Amino acid sequence: MDTNKVNIDVFESGEGIPIIYTHGWADDRTAWDGVIQLLSEGFRNIAWSIRGHGESDAPPPGNYTRDHTLGDLTQIVDMANSPVVLVGHSLGGYLSLAFCLKHPEKVKALVLIAAGPGFRKEETREQWNASVRASAKEMDIPDGSEEAALHIDSWVIDSLSEISAPVLVIVGENDKRFAASMAVFQKYLDVRESVVVPGAGHSVHRKYSSAVGSAIQRFLSILPS
């Protein structure tokens, strides 16, 4: 799929309620294979790789901002031609929150997996960004693609209460950094269910895809059609 002259790798399968899957930083759409297999009946599953990840194009540095990525996500959501369920892991969860703020009418429900809402304090954002940049130097990723994982402001966390879509929160028992975000989501979002997966870490959707898929299936079954 071409979005603004950048080819985005998209996988689609099934028919029914459209679900858009957005992975985390330095991952790709195959992270969702196990979950999608479990949700093969009754759902139109659409997984994509963020620009600079997986089989998607890697444009030059300066083309990986939040707005660039949200622009790609918008075009993918529009493929569904109806409100979608957004499922996001880590960075993908943050981007899904941002998308909800920009296009609330396009979102039926939201599933946040090992995700965070960003940071209010500039000092904390700078610490996070420094950690991302340091990690990027040690990784085999396209130049500049780490920009997608940087936090430039507190817009998302400051605006959480504006999101009205029903939410499912999933986190691994051992993922302490992102487990702390659960209380924030419960305070500001319409969280219908929170699931802690025993023994799981940050990649809960990969290693415990059955538990994650079952939680999503249960959550969507109780939502109005």
Question: Could you say what each language-model-derived stretch is?
Answer:
Residues K176-S181:
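Conserved alpha/beta-hydrolase "acid-adjacent" motif
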Residues H68-V84:
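Conserved acidic catalytic loop of the alpha/beta-hydrolase fold
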Residues Y94-K102, K108-A136:
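Flexible "cap/lid" loop of the alpha/beta hydrolase fold
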Residues I163, V169-V171:
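Short beta-strand/loop motif that positions the catalytic acidic residue
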Residues D9-D57:
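Conserved HGGG/HGGXW glycine-rich cap/lid loop of the alpha/beta-hydrolase fold
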Residues L86-G88, I113:
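Short beta-strand immediately N-terminal to the catalytic nucleophile in serine-hydrolase-like folds
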Residues A200-S209:
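Catalytic histidine-centered segment of alpha/beta-hydrolase-like enzymes
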